[in-house]
Amino acid sequence: HTIHGRAPTVASGLKLANPELSVWMVTGDGDGFSIGGNHLIHLLRRNFNINVMLFNNRIYGLTKGQYSPTSEQGKVTYSTPMGSLDYPFKPTQLALGAQGSFVAKTIDKELKHLQSMIRRAHDHNGTSFIEIYQNCNIFNDGAFGTLTDRDTKADKLLYLENGEPMIFGNEKNKGIILDGSKPKVVEIGKKYSIDDILVHDETDSLLANMLSDFTAHDDFPEPLGVLYCSERPTYDDLMAAQMGDSKKQPTQTLDDMLNAVSYTHLRAHETV
């Protein structure tokens, strides 16, 4: 975890220094998206082979209950006694915008699902980002109550399975369709059949962005699972290859390196 918000920098250096380590970074909605927000987005875009677990309880827990970057608008806390004016971040949407190669979401009380997401993250070659909804029973108790309550969670959670239709509900009789370019919740068995339901494709970044926006709308279920997964070269692998190429080059002095490219050549390159 390191000091507040700086875990991505330490994790990146650790991975470069010892590539064989399985590096896991634990952060929260406060340090991850405020003081450490710049570090987190660059970790994601660089695609280090590092696993990120972001515990989101929509509050600053360690610093005694101030509102966080994911607190809902209107949230009353010690630091916002009249209600927060800020629009909250959507963590998975932010991770996708930072070009994360693996973006998933789960919740603390769904233990089997949490375990499966951790396994998937471990198996991914690149930066894996898991948002984990976590209840803070001191400063924000019940923040995710409708998603964990036995009587309501079936109608509020959409479990994503790659290649499977997006269905949910106690009777598995609700699903997601595209109405033009917009998602829509429908009931299966009347006007719509299972064949009309949108099928999840975790390699589709446009679909992942659409799903990440469900969080902002009460009439849509909360998607849990792998929203997006793609393979591309990792920063640590590219660095190792670059260092290998460098070692093959003739030995140079500092003056040789400084004079290797002329100022005139640089200016010409910039003009082009």
Go through the PLM ranges and name each one.
Residues 132-224:
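Internal helical hairpin/lid segments
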